[in-house]
Curated annotation (Swiss-Prot):
UniProt xrefs under CDD domains: DEXHc_HrpA, SF2_C_RHA
Organism: Haemophilus influenzae (strain ATCC 51907 / DSM 11121 / KW20 / Rd)
Designated name of the protein: ATP-dependent RNA helicase HrpA homolog
PROSITE patterns linked to this entry: DEAH_ATP_HELICASE (PS00690), HELICASE_ATP_BIND_1 (PS51192), HELICASE_CTER (PS51194)
Sequence similarity: Belongs to the DEAD box helicase family. DEAH subfamily.
EC number(s) stated in the UniProt entry for this protein: 3.6.4.13
Motif DEAH box, residue range(s) on this chain: 203-206
Catalytic activity: ATP + H2O = ADP + phosphate + H(+)
GO molecular function: ATP binding; ATP hydrolysis activity; helicase activity; RNA binding; RNA helicase activity
Lineage, opening ranks: Bacteria, Pseudomonadati, Pseudomonadota, Gammaproteobacteria, Pasteurellales
Keywords (A to Z) from UniProt: ATP-binding, Helicase, Hydrolase, Nucleotide-binding
Residue ranges occupied by any Helicase ATP-binding domain in the UniProt entry: 93-257
Length: 1304
């Protein structure tokens, strides 16, 4: 309202000044208009006059400038009549004068690019402002400016100038300004209304570049609102010009035809069914065209590789008077120039689609069009720029056809059908529909054009592409979303404003900004400027190896980016030491494009200038690898890659899979993590310009983008906190596969619940708080009752305990550390706040458990063994466990354990009754009643449980149950005692339900433990006389509160004796017999001499019948037997020195005679054995085979090495009788084999039962004398069956032996 009132109240002075502004330049009009408005704010009349005079002077100066601009064009402007556009000059100038916007359509060569600016200049549009003329490429802007200046006969940079990125040839007198569309776009930021221009020519609009489409959209808004005086001329090839007209309210179109000749179109589709491919189709087309007559051929190809393959195939054709010329963007300037300098030979030009509209290849008569091209297309799915090969549009196909109608009639061969052509889209999609829009969106937002969706583009971009552009800018930190009353609004951040200031792609700009934080701005400016241009390193087709060797000097082992830094340093050194021409030649030798090097340097200096203007610090110290690549990474977060196992590819953002491009230094190395400057899809998705990175660099840069997921949180006792495994991903790439994190900060509620349950309820934490220890003690007491009674209903459930703590503990407590802080204050108010009461832990309906039924200790003699209870069905130690200290294992007997503890005894008896076969079990139904009756009568532990049970059941029912009928396998494991042997710290050594098995397996360890607790000196070795103290028959030692009992004995060491402690009295007895015998033999004269003197010759000869080695060994066996007899005759073992001396004298006195006596008996045994063996060697009937085999087995068991001592003196006569019985059996065998067989079967049955008994006996115990006697009872049975006439030692039968065996 204030501004409008000012306008309506202009003073006469102001009105006078405003009336003079129409004749001065637009920029001056805007500047002075603001000053004239300012006069109205000055109160002093005198001051107003002074300012007005100053403004008047500036108006005069501005008028003078306009006059100078008018007079700058002195010569008449010439328009070449040969150009089609010149012939329409009057019509075109009339349209320009009458309309704000016009569209000029014409093919390349019509002259519109060079003549339209001259027409506008002639109309005077250069007087009050510049005639702006945009070109899609920098080289075109420079060359067109030079051409127009030449035609106007003026110096470049004066009347005609140009401005491209980082190169400005403009002066105050410039009226025609050539520039790239990117320059005009950048100028809009500082000159939003384009006041420096009176006319704009947007050339090559048909290319539909992103910049051009944005400029046209911007002008669509600007012209009718702010710049009705601004003229706009849109030039285009004859492609979809109506679209431009409609965009500007049906602006008039004038079509200027180029100089063209008729072109014949021939369709020669490649037929796959005929095994014909595109290359063969091209070769066929070349043959067909050469047959038409001489003329240059232009063949359109998809890319560099196809061009080289086709060139190689054509060279093999040996075409006469023909040269083959490639044309593509990466080609060196020298090779490109060959196209424009005919050599006189027929030329075949192989070109990419750059030759469609942007570049005129002269003298083309024929065109071969395969109908495809690589078209840059943004993939919404993968978020990468693809370069797929696609069928070209009809408009592009017609442009290609038009290349050959310029100099004469031409022929265009299309390698596809006419139907294919007619089915194709009419026009190629504009760039805005197939590219990432991040840069445009950033610039628009910086210009205040926030509503991108409403912006009047010629063709509105895909909404998804807009969102992707926004997401990329969010990735770079350029945008932030704020909540307003009207909803969410996207605002430019400080970083975003800085990105918009830097004249490079947003990704590259982000790298420079990040370099500030990492101290590598200098290096980043070099790399970013290199990434902004085409690679200056050239690789000519015929010199690939040589160029590769030159470029390899600059390579870095880990990064393609660092090659630019190395190259930059090299170029700086070369420039210092060389003149300009020398440097140019050196670049050529090094296969470096000189113009691109200059462009690189120009861009670097422009970036450096911008960086300084933004006051960003530039480092002077050299940056390290990590600094540089972390800064690069900040702009390439969606271009990271994780190596996939066993594949030559990487997992990229959004599940993309890409490979490293073959020209990378990392192509063969394939590190685990990489980043790529760009991802481009051709035959596959390639990562170009790659470097090795570390995953830990990523997360700090991508905090706003990463996603975190967590495993199920668990309590960590060691950390005293709730921990979860965190997985960190960036666009789906796992940058942290797994790491433990404190879950308390992530979800306090869940963490508090887990803390209470795991730490307080379940006890899983390390703490010294008194309340907790007391609570745990009370819980253990109640749990022990549950284990004892094998019930789960005594202790209150975890939920009750959880609620107890939950109601009392602060909500902020999520870990042990938090608890300690809270409890320090809380206990001051109520120290017993968290204490359990015993009654609180017991369920109201739980029955009481008697300590008598479930004792804590088992008493056996003087032993007191700890009992523990475990109610864990299915586990090894389910039930009652007896804890036996290792040194006491030898003292514990199985006696009594079969009765179980009182609390389980009834259940055990019931289970035993139910284990009986049905024929017996039915006599004791119901089993619980009989179990109760049995327990009321029996005296526990007095006799073995089964013996007592058999007796009582027989008393109650009259039914006798045999021992073998009880099936212990069916008895539940918890009813069987578990024996656990423990070390001195109570730690388990071994565990089993078989006590004898434990004793056998741990025998050596028990022996070691007994020796370990013995007094020094009690165990000895290397003794030859009784030089030691009296031996106690039982040795006891206290250890850790229990009595360790052992049994010392003299042990045989062959040449000496020793003293050793044994676990049992039986082991002591066996060892003492051998040890005492050896000590006596060491202290009495040997009887061998006496034996030689007194033994009859016959007896001596008989001894030689021994089949067991040396006769001396047999004699030693006899002597040992004699000593054993004398010890027994003396009264047994002696335990002191005095007793030993008496025994020694007794043995010395009687040893000779007893030895001779034994030797004579042994001679008779050996002689008889020899005779029997001789009889067995004779011929026998086959029917006697089983009997003879049995006899041989019997003889081997009677007479063997060491049989004399082992049998003993009293058994020798029996051995002789047993052998005589064998002789009688052999006599009878021939008479009645069947009778022998029947008797042998009776013996075999008894022998088999005896062997089963031996297998069943505990391994930990030696065989008792009683069991050993059964072996001789079987020999007596043989005498009774085979030689009854010899008589037996006592009454014997197989039944009697069976009854004795069954008792075990």
């Amino acid at each position: 309202m204030k501004n409008s009132s000012v306008k309506h109240t202009l003073t006469p002075l102001q009105q006078s000044l405003f009336s003079q502004l129409n004749d001065i330049m637009l920029v001056d009009q805007r500047r002075l208009s603001a000053r004239i408005h300012g006069i109205g704010k000055i109160k002093s009349q005198e001051a107003q006059q002074a300012v007005a005079a100053e403004i008047q002077q500036q108006i005069e100066q501005a008028r003078l400038r306009v006059e100078q601009r008018k007079s700058a064009v002195q010569n008449p402007i010439v328009f070449p009549e040969s150009l089609p556009v010149s012939q329409r000059k009057v019509e075109i100038q009339k349209l320009i004068s009458e309309h704000q916007v016009i569209v000029v359509a014409g093919e390349t060569g019509s002259g519109k690019t060079t003549q339209l600016p001259k027409m506008c200049l002639e109309l005077g549009f250069g007087n009050l402002g510049m005639i702006g003329h945009t070109q899609p490429r920098r080289i075109a802007a420079r060359s067109v400016a030079a051409r127009i200046a030449e035609e106007l006969e003026t110096e470049l940079g004066g009347l005609v100038g140009y401005k491209v990125r980082f190169n400005d040839q403009i002066s105050d007198n410039t009226q025609i300004k050539l520039m790239t569309d990117g320059i005009l776009l950048a100028e809009i930021q500082n000159d939003r209304f384009l006041n420096q221009y009176s006319c704009l020519i947007i050339d090559e609009a048909h290319e539909r570049s992103l910049n051009n489409d944005f400029i046209l959209g911007y002008l669509k808004q600007l012209l009718p609102r702010r710049r009705r005086d601004l003229k706009l001329i849109i030039t285009s090839a004859t492609i979809d010009v109506e679209r431009f007209s409609k965009h500007f309210n049906n602006a008039p179109i004038i079509e200027v035809s180029g100089r063209t000749y008729p072109v014949e179109v021939r369709y020669r589709p490649v037929v796959e069914e005929d095994d014909q491919d595109q290359l063969q189709g091209i070769l066929n087309a070349v043959d067909e065209l050469q047959a038409e007559g001489r003329g240059d051929i232009l063949i359109f190809m998809n890319g560099e590789r196809e061009i080289r393959d086709t060139a190689e195939a054509l060279q093999k054709q040996n075409l006469k008077h023909t040269e083959i010329l490639p044309l593509f963007a990466r080609l060196s300037a020298q090779e490109q120039n060959k196209i424009f300098h005919p050599s006189g030979l027929n030329r075949i030009v192989l070109a990419t689609n750059v030759a469609e509209t942007s570049l005129t290849v002269p003298s083309i008569k024929y065109v071969i069009d395969p109908g495809t091209a690589r078209i840059s297309r943004y993939s919404y799915r993968t978020k990468v720029q693809r370069l797929p090969i696609e069928p070209i549009s009809q408009a592009s196909a017609n442009q290609r056809k038009g290349r050959c109608g310029r100099v004469s009639e031409g022929i265009c061969i299309r390698l596809y059908s006419e139907e294919d052509f007619n089915s194709r889209p009419e026009f190629t999609d504009p760039e805005i529909l197939r590219t990432n829009l991040a840069s445009v969106i950033l610039q628009m937002t910086a210009l205040g054009l926030d509503d991108i969706e409403a912006f009047p583009f010629v063709d509105a971009p895909d909404e998804r592409h807009i969102q992707d552009g926004v997401k990329l800018l969010e990735e770079l930190g350029a945008f932030e979303t704020v909540q307003t009353k009207s909803g969410e609004k996207r605002l430019l951040t400080r970083v975003g404003r800085q990105l918009a200031q830097l004249p490079v792609d947003p990704r590259l700009a982000k790298m420079i900004l990040s370099a500030v934080n990492f101290g590598c701005v200098y290096e980043m400016m070099i790399i970013v400027s290199a990434l902004s241009i085409q690679d200056p390193r050239e690789r000519p087709q015929e010199k690939q190896q040589a160029s590769d060797e030159k470029h390899r000097r600059f390579a870095d082992k880990k990064s393609d980016f660092l090659a630019f830094l190395n190259l930059w340093r090299y170029l700086q050194e070369q420039q210092k030491e060389s003149s300009k021409n020398q440097f140019r030649r050196q670049c050529q030798k090094d296969f470096l494009n000189y113009l691109r090097i200059r462009e690189w340097q120009d861009i670097y200096h422009q970036i450096r200038l911008t960086v300084r203007e933004m006051s960003l610090p530039i480092n002077s110290e050299k940056a390290e690898y990590q600094q540089i690549h972390t800064a690069l990474l900040s702009g390439l977060l969606s271009h990271i890659g994780l190596k996939e196992a066993e594949k030559q590819q990487y997992l990229g953002a959004r599940n993309a899979h890409f490979a490293i491009f073959p020209n990378s230094v990392l192509f063969k190395k394939q590190p685990k993590w990489v980043m790529a400057a760009e991802l481009v899809e051709t035959s596959k998705l390639w990562g170009r310009m790659v470097a090795e990175i570390e995953p830990e660099w990523i997360e700090p840069l991508a905090e706003h983008l990463i996603k975190k997921s967590y495993s199920v949180p668990l309590w960590s006792k060691s950390r005293g906190a709730v921990i979860a495994d965190e997985k960190v991903t960036l666009y789906g790439v796992p940058i942290v596969a797994v790491r433990p994190v404190n879950y308390g900060a992530i979800d306090p509620t869940v963490s508090r619940e887990i803390f209470i349950q795991s730490a307080l309820v379940e006890g899983g934490w390390n703490t010294k708080h008194k309340f907790f220890k007391e609570n745990q003690r009370l819980v253990r007491e109640v749990e022990e009752l549950e284990h004892k009674s094998r019930r789960r209903d005594i202790l209150v459930d975890d939920r009750t305990l959880f609620e107890f703590y939950d109601q009392r503990i602060g909500t902020e407590v999520v870990s042990q550390k938090h608890f300690d802080t809270w409890w320090k204050k809380a206990q001051q108010k109520d120290p017993e706040l968290l204490n359990f009461e015993h009654s609180f832990l017991i369920n109201d309906d739980a029955e009481q458990v008697s300590k008598l039924d479930f004792p804590n200790f088992w008493h056996q003699g003087n032993l007191k063994l700890k009992l523990t209870y475990q109610f864990e069905p299915g586990t090894d130690a389910d039930g009652v466990t007896v804890h036996i200290p290792l040194p006491l294992l030898n003292q514990v007997e199985m006696t009594g354990f079969d009765w179980q503890i009182p609390g389980l005894r009834e259940e055990l008896v019931i289970a035993l009754i139910k284990s009986l076969p049905k024929s017996y079990r039915r006599n004791f139904v119901p089993a619980p009643n009989y179990a109760q009756a049995f327990l009321s009568r029996a005296v526990p532990l007095e006799k073995p449980l089964l013996d007592t049970l058999i007796y009582e059941l027989r008393r109650m029912t009259g039914v006798t149950v045999e021992a073998e009928h009880w099936n212990w396998e069916q008895i539940p494991s918890h009813l069987k005692m578990t024996f656990r042997v423990v070390d001195e710290n109570g730690k388990k050594i071994a565990e089993s339900m078989n006590l004898d098995e434990l004793k056998f397996n741990l025998k050596d360890r028990v022996q070691e433990s007994i020796s370990a607790v013995a007094d020094d000196g009690i165990e000895q070795s290397g003794l030859h006389i009784w030089s030691f103290a009296d031996l106690p028959q039982c040795y006891e030692q206290k250890q850790r509160g229990f009595s360790v009992k052992a049994f010392p004995a003299i042990v045989d060491e062959k040449d000496a004796v020793g003293i050793k402690l044994f676990e049992t009295e039986f082991e002591q007895s066996v060892a003492m017999q051998q040890g005492l015998r050896r000590l006596l033999l060491l202290n009495v004269p040997s009887p061998i001499k006496y034996l030689h003197e007194k033994l009859p010759n016959k007896a001596k000869l008989g001894l030689y019948f021994t089949p067991f080695g040396r006769v001396l060994d047999l004699i030693d066996d006899c002597i040992a037997c004699a000593v054993d007899k004398l010890i027994a005759d003396f009264g047994g073992f002696v335990w002191d020195e005095a007793g030993f001396e008496k025994l020694r004298d007794f043995v010395r006195e009687n040893l000779n005679e007893v030895t001779v006596d034994i030797a004579q008996k042994v001679e008779q045994i050996l002689t008889l054995t020899y005779q029997l063996n001789q009889r067995l060697k004779g011929k026998m009937d086959f029917t006697m085979a089983f009997a003879l085999s049995d006899i041989k087995s019997q003889l081997a068991g009677l007479v063997y090495q060491g049989f004399v001592q082992k049998s003993g003196y009293d058994r020798l006569p029996d051995l002789q009788r047993y052998l005589q019985a064998v002789d009688k059996r052999i006599d009878k065998l021939a008479q009645d084999v069947n009778r022998d067989r029947a008797a042998m079967l009776r013996v075999e049955q008894v022998q088999q039962a005896y062997q089963q008994l031996l297998a069943k006996l505990p391994k930990s115990k030696p065989i008792s004398d009683e069991v050993a006697e059964i072996r001789y009872m079987i020999e007596e049975l043989r005498v009774s069956l085979f030689a009854q006439q010899l008589g037996t030692k006592y009454q014997i039968s197989d039944k009697r032996i069976g009854n004795i065996i069954s008792q075990y």
